[in-house]
Amino acid sequence: MFEPMELTNDAVIKVIGVGGGGGNAVEHMVRERIEGVEFFAVNTDAQALRKTAVGQTIQIGSGITKGLGAGANPEVGRNAADEDRDALRAALEGADMVFIAAGMGGGTGTGAAPVVAEVAKDLGILTVAVVTKPFNFEGKKRMAFAEQGITELSKHVDSLITIPNDKLLKVLGRGISLLDAFGAANDVLKGAVQGIAELITRPGLMNVDFADVRTVMSEMGYAMMGSGVASGEDRAEEAAEMAISSPLLEDIDLSGARGVLVNITAGFDLRLDEFETVGNTIRAFASDNATVVIGTSLDPDMNDELRVTVVATGIGMDKRPEITLVTNKQVQQPVMDRYQQHGMAPLTQEQKPVAKVVNDNAPQTAKEPDYLDIPAFLRKQAD
């Protein structure tokens, strides 16, 4: 008989909001009372830091900006972060995993976020960035700054999630207020952090611990996540399908993902066949050449509901490992066999193909992260 496992979680997770956009996103998370993480706000703007609800703040570049901000100049933002590398290092030390939230295109977020990531990686910390890209109406110059910032940031993070603000406009409609639109963007950032944090902080029958998260999230490249909640007899299949069809995953060829992290959250009525159903649904898109980590966690408040969270990482990277299925407990062999036998055609790679990758003429269908969409709850608001 399965018994709930008491979770001993020593992993330290820190969330760093860089610049105005990142600071707003972290402040939003603080107000939503996300558990199991420490929050920091980093900015060149002293006034913004005085007003924030984030408990721990770091002012950077006071000798350069005199506390007045970076003036929409990423070079100033970078120099400001360089000036206070020691303060950033002190804040990051002791963390096992760091989320960096920033809005790309401005001065501080664009210039300083890559420096924060660089410091984190120098400390050996698993580093994930969740950033927004500017609206098209903000101009080509700001968009160019954003693209440059994302390129630089990608050099220093393990996984990178980008959310184009224009997707908010398309999904929520032109009648949405500016405050509500940016609030929705903050919800996207919050969902990414909360979804991964809960994977390793909630106890369950099959825990996804920090080592599992590191295995998947360290597959360097672009990352996407989706989640689904359903109830009733077919709740497992419905929740899994919602997770993998979430707009965050839409328009992306997930067969190129090098890592897939799956967490099933339900009450004490979770059945073994429901675990298998989720596994069978995930296998329909998982590549042959991926690390798949599956876990379950228990939430007595879920009642009849079941939630599936899927994180796909390493998208767009060339080197891919042989498939590995990682769980904390043994899965029935038929399920294991099906994971190893099924997979979508891999992307064409400019390298020697690994075993099982024999389709050298397959068209490259993966799209750039610009095409990331908005989570299902936002799409439903527009319906």
UniProtKB/Swiss-Prot annotation:
Keywords from the named record: ADP-ribosylation, Cell cycle, Cell division, Cytoplasm, GTP-binding, Nucleotide-binding, Septation
Effect of residue 105 to S: In FtsZ-84; loss of GTPase-activity and conversion to an ATPase
The organism of origin for this protein: Escherichia coli (strain K12)
Superkingdom to which the source organism belongs: Bacteria
Record's protein name: Cell division protein FtsZ
Known regulation of activity: Formation of the FtsZ ring is inhibited by SulA, MinCD, DicB and toxins CbtA and CptA. Inhibition by toxin CbtA, SulA or DicB overexpression is neutralized by cytoskeleton bundling-enhancing protein CbeA, while inhibition by toxin CptA is neutralized by antitoxin CptB. Either FtsA or ZipA is required for Z ring formation and stabilization.
Recorded family membership: Belongs to the FtsZ family.
Record's comment describing the protein's domains: The central and C-terminal regions are required for dimerization.
GO MF annotations in UniProt: GTP binding; GTPase activity; identical protein binding
SUPFAM superfamilies: Tubulin C-terminal domain-like, Tubulin nucleotide-binding domain-like
Induction / repression: Repressed 1.3-fold by hydroxyurea (at protein level).
Subunit record text: Homodimer. Polymerizes to form a dynamic ring structure in a strictly GTP-dependent manner. Polymers persist as long as GTP is present and disappear rapidly as soon as it is consumed. Interacts directly with several other division proteins, including FtsA and ZipA. Interacts with polymerization inhibitors SulA, CbtA and CptA. Interacts with MreB and polymerization bundling-enhancing factor CbeA. Interacts with CbtA, YkfI and YpjF.
CDD domains from the UniProt entry: FtsZ_type1
Residue positions where (Microbial infection) ADP-ribosylarginine is found in the record: 174, 338
